[in-house]
């Protein structure tokens, strides 16, 4: 009886990997964070392995000799097994081994099996280069994500990895599946005029900024991530959440719809519509119930005033909360312009306070103090936070300005233009009239006639700093 090696490789890669994954799962019986870590490790590898396959085919590391059941030229069975073996399996089987050792085990496994998969996998002379890059960009980050999730460590780091993984799933894997199922083709962006590409990039950036800012808010204000098994510890009602309840879901739906239009593929746009119905159906009901159970009346009050999918024009503020405070130096030229600009606008839940009156320390930059939980922020980030108290348009500008790379570059420009840090000494306890609440003041102005202690540099330069 003749057995086709081609079929053995394709069937074996799927069933052996699936059985191994199931066996490790039954052995470890992961729950809670261990379950979440294993799933996230697999999620990371879904876009990463597919991208590695495309790079390998283009650079000659290896190629696939297969027909039927393909996703971007990669057999789906090989694709899924690879994602399992580099994702969930090592995360569950070797949770405490050094990651270098885990990578060495995976390398030994591939050295034995990849040449044996010759009927399907054709290895090039430099395939070990691709193997090393795959271990570095697929396996190792997925194991870091799993371990940080299990140990509740490196919140910012695991949030960044989650964003990369889910962005790859949303903008790469899901469109590839939709196009593959519909038997249509990718539209080559090179065929578009430059002005069209520029326009589409800018359009796609709008929902992307909203989604990224929402994740940032979960990390900085909520102490958690968007993953249901790794949620924020605090109810997040600031940033994009002050305008709409589901900014991340809204961002994903709009991104898929725009991507479908860009690719001229209705199936990709339809995936966005399906994601919307799923989010408003079972997922939305389950999430709302969980939030109601965890946060009680605070959640109910928030959900009553903030819509799930249609943003407000003005930010929501909990009744009775004290206003956030923006500390601005009274005797500072550049800062005075910032102070005056905010005083002329109708902000909600924001008070401008002389920096000289800070209760605990001498400030060196404009400083924003949030109304609820969260740490103070300074400089460009403080101004960006204050913009969120105006209206949706200015809030979006603030969200874009707060993104890490953008914030760093903007602060660099400010510092290079004369806005470097400068110490503002504490002078006295402010009189109530020295604090301007922008909740009700439309055209208020801070007038503080009391003397302020200034540094020697202030007296010499008389200029302001952000």
Residue ranges and their predicted role:
Residues 330-331:
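Short pre-active-site segment immediately N-terminal to redox-active cysteine/selenocysteine motifs
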């Amino acid at each position: 009886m003749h057995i086709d090696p081609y079929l053995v490789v394709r069937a074996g890669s799927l069933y052996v990997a699936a059985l191994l994954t199931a066996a490790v799962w039954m052995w470890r019986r992961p729950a809670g964070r261990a379950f979440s870590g294993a799933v996230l490790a697999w999620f990371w590898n879904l876009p990463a392995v597919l991208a590695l396959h495309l790079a390998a085919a283009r650079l000659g590391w290896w190629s696939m000799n297969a027909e039927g059941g393909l996703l971007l030229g990669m057999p789906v069975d090989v694709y899924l097994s690879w994602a399992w073996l580099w994702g969930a399996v090592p995360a569950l089987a070797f949770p405490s081994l050094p990651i270098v050792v885990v990578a060495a085990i995976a390398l030994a496994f591939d050295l034995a099996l990849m040449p044996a998969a010759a009927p399907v996998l054709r290895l090039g002379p430099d395939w070990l280069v691709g193997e090393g890059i795959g271990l570095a960009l697929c396996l190792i980050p997925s194991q870091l994500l799993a371990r940080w999730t299990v140990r509740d460590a490196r919140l910012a780091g695991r949030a960044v990895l989650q964003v990369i993984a889910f962005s790859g799933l949303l903008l790469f894997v899901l469109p590839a599946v939709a196009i593959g199922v519909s038997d249509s083709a990718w539209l080559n962006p090179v065929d578009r005029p430059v002005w069209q590409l520029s326009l589409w990039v800018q359009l796609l950036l709008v929902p992307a900024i909203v989604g990224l800012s929402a994740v940032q808010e979960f990390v900085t204000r909520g102490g958690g991530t968007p993953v249901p098994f790794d949620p924020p510890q605090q109810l997040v009602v600031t940033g994009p959440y002050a305008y709409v309840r589901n900014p991340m879901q809204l961002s994903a739906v709009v991104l898929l719809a725009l991507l479908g239009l860009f690719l001229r593929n209705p199936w990709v746009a339809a995936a966005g519509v399906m994601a919307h119905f799923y989010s408003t159906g079972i997922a939305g009901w389950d999430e709302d119930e969980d939030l109601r159970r965890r946060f009680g009346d605070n959640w109910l009050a928030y959900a009553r005033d903030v819509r799930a999918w249609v943003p407000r024009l003005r930010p929501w503020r909990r009744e009775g909360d004290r206003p956030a405070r923006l500390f601005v130096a009274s005797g500072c030229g550049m800062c005075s312009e910032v102070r005056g600009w905010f005083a002329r606008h109708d902000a909600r839940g924001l008070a401008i306070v002389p920096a000289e009156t800070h209760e605990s320390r001498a400030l060196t930059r404009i400083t924003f103090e949030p109304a609820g939980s969260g740490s103070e922020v300074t400089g460009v980030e403080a101004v960006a936070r204050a913009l969120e108290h105006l209206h949706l348009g200015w809030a979006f500008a603030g969200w874009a300005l707060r993104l890490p790379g953008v914030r760093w570059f903007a602060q660099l420009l400010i510092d290079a233009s004369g806005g470097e840090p400068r110490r503002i000494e504490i002078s006295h306890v402010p009189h109530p009239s020295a604090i301007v609440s922008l909740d009700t003041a439309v055209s208020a102005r801070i007038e503080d006639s009391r003397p302020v202690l200034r540094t020697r540099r202030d007296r010499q330069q008389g200029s302001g700093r952000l």
